[in-house]
Amino acid sequence: MKGNFYQVDIPYKLVLAIDDNQVIGHVAVYLRDVYLDSFPETIGILSCVVVAHKYRGKGVAASLIKRAHAILKEHSVNFSILFAVSHAYYLSSGYIPMKNLTRFIENNEKKEFIYDGGMVCELGSQNWNVNILELNGEVV
């Protein structure tokens, strides 16, 4: 990736995978105060899961996600969400498709829809029984 990618928020943590003093992968970890069906909750959002091409298929992304989940659990976060182009990979890391309405802001405009790429992972003892996820701002 090139350029100023983190245009909305700077991640809470950036988890790196390093081999031979080179970054070979990373995932951005965000903590976000949201509303789940009108109830306040802090959730985790994972973004920018990237692994260098020659390291793909070797468990690097799974290790990054596992570490990101550990960080979120340290903050008693019950849910981690992400927005994926393809669900296939993230299913093996415990994510399931979200079927709820998501509200957010994009280009200073309020939007809402059910996003096919939205996925959630239950990190705590609570179940994701959410009808409306209010992100209280822009999508990362």
Task: Please state what every model-predicted region is.
Residues 1-50:
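A conserved beta-strand-loop-helix scaffold within acyl/acetyltransferase catalytic domains
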Residues 19-22, 54, 122-126:
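Short loop segments at secondary-structure junctions
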Residues 46-56, 85:
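A short, internal acetyl-CoA/4′-phosphopantetheine-binding micro-motif in the GNAT/acyltransferase core
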Residues 32-34, 54, 87:
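Short coil/turn motifs at secondary-structure junctions
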Residues 74-79, 84-109:
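Conserved active-site alpha-helix within GNAT-family acetyltransferase domains
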